[in-house]
Amino acid sequence: MFKGSMPALVTPFRNGELDLETLKKLVEWHIGEGSNGLVPVGTTGESPTLTHKEHEVVVEEVVKAAAGRVPVIAGAGSNNTLEAIRLVRHAEAVGADAALVVTPYYNKPTQSGLIAHFTALHDCADLPIIIYNIPGRSVVDMSPETMGKLAELPRIIGVKDATGDLARVCDQRSTCGPDFMQLSGEDATAHGFNAQGGVGCISVTANVAPKLLSQMQAACLAGDYATALSIQDRLMPLHKAIFIEPGLVGVKYAMSQLDLCSEEVRLPLTALSDETRALVDAGLRHAGLMN
């Protein structure tokens, strides 16, 4: 159910407020362009700077707009287990297909703490849970052994892996089993991740190039890595440019260049520098997305 290219959706703003009309248009556009799923209110969706109510509204609107045509994986992570439970239960109540739960950031739990946290989330609802392991942001790295223990729980179904370590795919397959779903969380290494046994990517760049990334993921799933590599080469300058500064800022600027949404972000994030804008523009042209 959760395979292929799934954009980590941006949250559009206009004059400091949620721009829900643009959000709905983006959902339609992504489905039309071939995206295989939608992932609202993750890092790229600026979840840290949304209010609790805004977080819930975005999930609700994406679920309603998708209307069952593609799965919706709702961001539901927190370093407060009780808050994460509330988010998982809300995602289930409004009809999301799964919850994406980041490892608790800032308070640095042990591996035992990670097991307790994710077990509590597993037990609080009937919603499938995808672990989000991103040690560069959370400052805690879930080990393959810990992941293997959590994979024994029936509703812990997979991982979004943003470690950048392609050897992890094999290690996690060994500890979690071949049916445990592994999704890349890094656009620049997604091709190699799939070659190691991954089945898709929760992608930032897919916000601006959904058709190309859907085609790349489809080629990987069909075993046609040569075609997938040609698409990845076409997109690599854009991947790299988007992440020179925070990726959601880069991709919102790229989207604004294609009139998809405003580049507006919330503090403490700020607009791209002129130098980075020029590199994103060059990446868009290299990908054939802009003249």
Swiss-Prot record:
One term under GO cellular component: cytosol
PROSITE patterns per UniProt: DHDPS_1 (PS00665), DHDPS_2 (PS00666)
One Pfam family named in its UniProt record: DHDPS
Family, similarity comment: Belongs to the DapA family.
NCBIfam families noted in UniProt: dapA
Quaternary organization: Homotetramer; dimer of dimers.
Protein name per its UniProtKB record: 4-hydroxy-tetrahydrodipicolinate synthase
Native source organism of the sequence: Roseobacter denitrificans (strain ATCC 33942 / OCh 114) (Erythrobacter sp. (strain OCh 114))
